[in-house]
């Protein structure tokens, strides 16, 4: 027997979905929180046990928030079915507030047979330290039960539309800025949760062997520092990594390079007029177009200095050399990564599990050769 549902609706109107699940990072007057959930019993076939929608108000008491309503309802059901394992998926218009995040973390710690994946359209008060800490506790992976939180991309919006919206047979049509907003929110969530890169991903993509092939992705690790009393002070809240967005039909039709995604992110930090230093560690040096855009950025933001350390030189047989020279001329520091930069990235951005950085054969030789090649490019030698 399934429990009785309260404070739920079966389907959402199309207009309500587009209004409430708009993924623009900063929005006002979105006071209703929608939580669409799917519960499956864990097993070989993973049958769906229930799909419903809870809703609540942002500024009401926490007990009326949809996350708390779900926990009360589901806890009653678990008392009668405590031996069953469940996989729970949420699609929420706002990520949980501090009290809800703490309550969900407590629930998961007490019931390890329940796994929870949370897809969020927007981040709620992500700039507040107490909120950041609550989400880190909820999603921490220190051997205990935890939630997995992700930003909704096109596929999740489409799934939510198909399962929970009264679409009247019409397909989901994304907003034009959905992929750009997704990139911003994904990077922000990575900063907030302090995501780390898989070791294999790092060694594969940052390997500086000159004969590397098949590496079509670009990874960009970044850190930000502020000048205070003649000392550069790290801003650890703005530290993370991202990668290029591959071309696809429903997101970026032409793709978007990692450098452009990074430039999209910087205004989101709302840096003031103090002096800042942004350092990027990239698996490939910028292409001509990205170099031009980065040059424009530092020209328009004189209080921000830019340092770029690249593992390899991106050679598209086009105007990449001109782009690098323009970027260098406009004030950016450009250099090839050497052992120190590789080790720093490994220690800072990689989920290394306590393992020290192990250089590959020829790292120093490749770095030296690439540095000589970059020097010749920047000095316009042989061109």
Curated annotation (Swiss-Prot):
Pfam families: NAD2. GO terms for cellular component: cytoplasm; nucleus; P-body; ribonucleoprotein complex. Keywords: Antiviral defense, Cytoplasm, Hydrolase, Immunity, Innate immunity, Metal-binding, Nucleus, Phosphoprotein, Repeat, Zinc. The keyword Protease does not apply. Its cofactor is Zn(2+). It comes from the Eukaryota. Residues 29-138, 214-327 form the CMP/dCMP-type deaminase domain. One of its GO terms (molecular function) is cytidine deaminase activity. Residues 1-60 are annotated as: Essential for cytoplasmic localization. One of its GO terms (biological process) is DNA cytosine deamination. Residues 209-335 are annotated as: Necessary for homooligomerization. Zn(2+) 2 binds at residues 257, 287, 290. Belongs to the cytidine and deoxycytidylate deaminase family. Homodimer. Homooligomer. Can bind RNA to form ribonucleoprotein complexes of high-molecular-mass (HMM) or low-molecular-mass (LMM). HMM is inactive and heterogeneous in protein composition because of binding nonselectively to cellular RNAs, which in turn are associated with variety of cellular proteins. The LMM form which is enzymatically active has few or no RNAs associated. Its ability to form homooligomer is distinct from its ability to assemble into HMM. Interacts with APOBEC3B, APOBEC3F, MOV10, AGO2, EIF4E, EIF4ENIF1, DCP2 and DDX6 in an RNA-dependent manner. The CMP/dCMP deaminase domain 1 mediates RNA binding, RNA-dependent oligomerization and virion incorporation whereas the CMP/dCMP deaminase domain 2 confers deoxycytidine deaminase activity and substrate sequence specificity. This is DNA dC->dU-editing enzyme APOBEC-3G. It comes from Macaca nigra (Celebes black macaque). The gene is APOBEC3G.
């Amino acid at each position: 027997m399934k429990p009785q549902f309260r404070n739920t609706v079966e389907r959402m109107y199309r207009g309500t979905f587009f209004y409430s699940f708009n993924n623009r990072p900063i929005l006002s007057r979105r006071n209703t929180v929608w939580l669409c959930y799917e519960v499956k019993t864990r097993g070989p076939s993973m049958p769906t046990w229930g799909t419903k929608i809870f809703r609540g108000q942002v500024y009401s008491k926490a007990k009326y928030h949809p996350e708390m309503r779900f926990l009360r309802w589901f806890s009653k059901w678990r008392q009668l079915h405590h031996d069953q394992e469940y996989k729970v998926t949420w699609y929420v218009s706002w990520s949980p507030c501090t009290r809800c995040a703490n309550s969900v973390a407590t629930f998961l710690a007490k019931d390890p047979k329940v796994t929870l994946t949370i897809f969020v359209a927007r981040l709620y008060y992500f700039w507040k330290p107490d909120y950041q800490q609550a989400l880190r506790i909820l999603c921490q992976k220190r051997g205990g039960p935890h939630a997995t939180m992700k930003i909704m991309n096109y596929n999740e919006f489409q799934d939510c539309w198909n399962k929970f919206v009264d679409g009247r047979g019409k397909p989901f049509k994304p907003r034009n800025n959905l992929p750009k907003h997704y990139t911003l929110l994904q990077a922000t969530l990575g900063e907030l949760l302090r995501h780390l890169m898989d070791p294999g991903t790092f060694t594969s993509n940052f390997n500086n062997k000159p004969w590397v092939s098949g590496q079509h992705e670009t990874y960009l690790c970044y850190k930000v520092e502020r000048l205070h009393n003649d000392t550069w002070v790290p801003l650890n809240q703005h530290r993370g990594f991202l990668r290029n967005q591959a071309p696809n039909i429903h997101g970026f039709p032409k793709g978007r390079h990692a450098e452009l995604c990074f430039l999209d992110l910087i205004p989101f930090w709302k840096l003031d007029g103090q002096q800042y230093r942004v350092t990027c560690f990239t698996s490939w040096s910028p292409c001509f177009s990205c170099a031009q855009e980065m040059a424009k950025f530092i020209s328009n933001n004189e209080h921000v200095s830019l340092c770029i350390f690249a593992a390899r030189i991106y050679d598209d047989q086009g105007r990449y050399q001109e782009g690098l020279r323009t970027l260098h001329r406009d004030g950016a520091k450009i250099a090839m990564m050497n052992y120190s930069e590789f080790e720093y990235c490994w220690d800072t951005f990689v989920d290394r599990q306590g393992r020290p950085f192990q250089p590959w054969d020829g790292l120093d030789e490749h770095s030296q050769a690439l540095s000589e090649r970059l020097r010749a490019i920047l000095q316009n030698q042989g061109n």
